[in-house]
Regions:
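Beta-rich catalytic cores
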Residues: 20, 46-48, 84, 110-112, ...
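Short, conserved, GDST-rich strand-edge loop motifs in beta-rich repeat architectures
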Residues: 11-20, 62-83, 128, 135-138, ...
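Blade-level signature of beta-propeller repeat domains, shared across WD40, Kelch, NHL, RCC1
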Residues: 233-314
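Surface-exposed loop and turn segments in beta-propeller and other repeat-based domains
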Residues: 37-45, 98-109, 146-166, 206-226, ...
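Short loop/turn segments immediately following beta-strands, especially the blade-tip
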Residues: 30-31, 90-96, 137-149, 194-206, ...
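Structural signature of eukaryotic scaffold interfaces centered on beta-propeller domains
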Residues: 1-4, 51-57, 113-121, 165-178, ...
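Asp-box/WD-like beta-propeller blade repeats and closely related beta-sheet repeat scaffolds
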Residues: 1-54
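Loop/turn-rich, solvent-exposed surfaces of beta-rich toroidal or solenoidal domains
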Residues: 122-140, 163-259
């Protein structure tokens, strides 16, 4: 969901039959349906996230999969069968149609969240590739061409109960409102990371904390057993407080963290050092959704009613 002046665009993953690529819903300021936003989807096979920079007349969209593919759960073989995305799409924002595709290949398996810098003059942006556990940096060159590079690569980790090393599963990324820090999660590993992106070509790791995950490094946080891993997160506008939740998608939760059915999810708060870099879990904050009156419940994402780091575009 993103603002469009006084209006709203919402991305969809598929149609009523669960078939990709979906498209974009255009709402007016009263939340009444205007219609489809896009004039054409071109040959885009999948949809997921999007972000735009009006001053560059560009929108970038990413790919997950068709609802019929991901809703039953995750099957690694379907990645090889090309049922999951590996591309970013460049749009002509004014014409509302895709004009270019960046093929990421093995470096960009399941590219999910897309973020441009908040500076409206900047052409620099990032995408987190969930299965590859990489961060892709893209920008417009001086010649006016869109370029991309892999700037962060999270190594897979061995696990005694897994036949293959565990990928991080980077399901989200976030850029602070001042464009100084990029945050990422590794949902299966169990860590949150902070990178200084003052030089977007060379992010510098400045902070890391653990919560839940399959590696067993922080199974309990503030007295609560974390069944899940860091998944979605929201940063305060001053960049000092981050709220992290643990549920990705119910069937995927049940597949990788079956205890979440009975334990529920949790919200953890991280204190972020905006001057020198660094992260630490706030010891005085925890929300245990397993103890909800009608629970156990799961928590997916936190948003601010007046706008936040993941919705506001200038």
């Amino acid at each position: 969901v993103h603002c469009l002046g006084s209006e709203i665009i919402i991305s969809f993953l598929g149609n009523a039959k669960g078939e990709a690529p979906g498209g974009y819903l255009h709402l007016d300021k009263d939340f009444e349906i205007v219609g489809r936003w896009e004039n054409s989807m071109g040959d885009i096979p999948f949809s997921y996230d999007f972000w735009y920079q009006p001053r560059h007349n560009v929108m970038v969209s990413s790919e997950w999969a068709a609802p019929n593919t991901f809703m039953p759960g995750f099957d690694l073989e379907e990645v090889g069968h090309l049922k999951y995305g590996r591309r970013l799409h460049i749009w002509d924002f004014k014409e509302k149609k895709p004009v270019e595709t960046m093929y990421l290949g093995e470096d960009g398996l399941i590219p999910l969240e897309v973020k441009f810098m908040h500076d409206p003059d900047s052409s620099h942006g990032f995408c987190g590739a969930a299965l590859s556990s990489n961060v892709i940096h893209f920008w417009k060159s001086q010649e006016g061409k869109w370029e991309w590079e892999k700037v962060i690569d999270i190594e897979n980790e061995p696990h005694p109960d897994w036949p293959i090393p565990i990928p991080g599963v980077m399901s989200a990324i976030l850029i602070s409102m001042d464009d100084k820090y990029l945050y990422l999660n590794n949902w299966l590993h169990g860590d949150m990371r902070q990178y200084d992106i003052s030089n977007p070509h060379k992010p510098k790791l400045t902070g890391q904390v653990w919560m839940g995950g399959l590696l067993g490094k922080a199974p309990i946080v503030n007295g609560v057993k974390i069944t899940g891993g860091p998944q979605m997160y929201q940063l305060s506008l001053d960049g000092k407080r981050m709220y992290v939740t643990t549920s990705l998608f119910s069937t995927w939760d049940n597949q990788f963290y079956p205890e979440i059915r009975t334990q529920g999810g949790a919200m953890i708060m991280i204190d972020c050092d905006v001057e020198n870099g660094g992260m630490k879990i706030n010891k005085d904050f925890i929300v245990d959704f397993g103890k909800e009156p009608n629970g156990p419940s799961r928590c997916h994402e936190s948003r601010y009613p007046g706008g936040d780091c993941t919705s506001d575009i200038w």
